[in-house]
């Protein structure tokens, strides 16, 4: 083994879907890591991006995504990839290849860009880009521990069915959506509900909508 030899890593996503029995909405992705030589461990940082330009959109979906990309006439300028999240993953010792799980915690907060994007899609797939950085630990020819950084030019693609997102959210919020309010707005809404002896938040919103036509 050359003194400066270091593992050459390759990454691919083999599967993706809903993480069963998670306490909060979570997607999971099966990540295959391959190496040209034995590895002690990998401290991996996985960056996820939504490659929004890599799928078609119906007119209904364009309307649902207007807050992200503007009206149909603006899409040529505004349609772009969206940063989703970063996930740290610890990979244990392996030779040749190993399969690890990348859990991605999700939210139904529509103020979050990725959530708005998923919520605006009716069907099809979400094109995802995975970028990989971090540090690989390995032994040299004399058995001494060596450390090398992982270049961010390592990438993998995966297409996640929109149905996986909807299944996950329906499992955690059955028949419901989620709305975030500033505290002042919530206090006013709560006072309106109490003042009008309304029993649920649905009744409160309906009363306000009916009042304003």
Across the structure, where does each feature detected by a protein language model lie?
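Surface-exposed, Lys/Arg-rich phosphate-binding patches that contact polyanionic backbones
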Residues: 183-200
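A short beta-turn/strand-edge loop motif at beta-sheet boundaries
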Residues: 35-42, 198
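Extended, solvent-exposed segments with strong compositional bias
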Residues: 64-119
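Short aromatic-acidic-glycine turn motif
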Residues: 49-60
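Low-complexity, acidic Ser/Thr/Pro/Gly-rich terminal tails and inter-domain linkers that flank the onset
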Residues: 1-28
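Short, basic amphipathic alpha-helical segments that act as recognition/interaction helices
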Residues: 199-213
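Internal, hydrophobic beta-strand segments that form the core of beta-sheet-rich folds
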Residues: 30, 45-51, 100-153
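Short beta-strand elements
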Residues: 63-73, 137-178
């Amino acid at each position: 083994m050359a003194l400066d030899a270091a593992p050459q890593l390759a990454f691919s996503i083999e599967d993706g879907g809903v993480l069963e029995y998670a306490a909060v909405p979570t997607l999971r992705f099966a990540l295959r890591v391959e190496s040209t030589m034995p590895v002690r461990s990998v401290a991996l940082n996985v960056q996820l991006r939504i490659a929004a330009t890599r799928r078609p959109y119906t007119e209904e979906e364009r309307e649902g995504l207007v807050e992200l990309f503007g009206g149909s006439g603006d899409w040529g300028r505004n349609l772009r990839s969206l940063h989703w999240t970063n996930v740290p993953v610890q990979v244990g010792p392996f030779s040749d290849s190993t399969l690890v799980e990348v859990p991605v915690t999700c939210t139904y907060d529509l103020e979050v860009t990725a959530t708005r994007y998923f919520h605006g899609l009716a069907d099809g797939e979400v094109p995802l880009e995975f970028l990989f950085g971090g540090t690989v630990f390995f032994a040299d020819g004399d058995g001494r521990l060596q450390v090398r950084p992982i270049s961010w030019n390592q990438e993998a693609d995966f297409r996640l069915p929109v149905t996986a997102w909807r299944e996950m959210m329906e499992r955690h919020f059955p028949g419901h959506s989620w709305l975030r309010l500033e505290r002042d707005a919530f206090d006013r809404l709560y006072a309106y509900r109490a003042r009008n002896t309304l029993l649920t938040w649905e009744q409160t919103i309906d009363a306000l909508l009916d009042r304003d036509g």
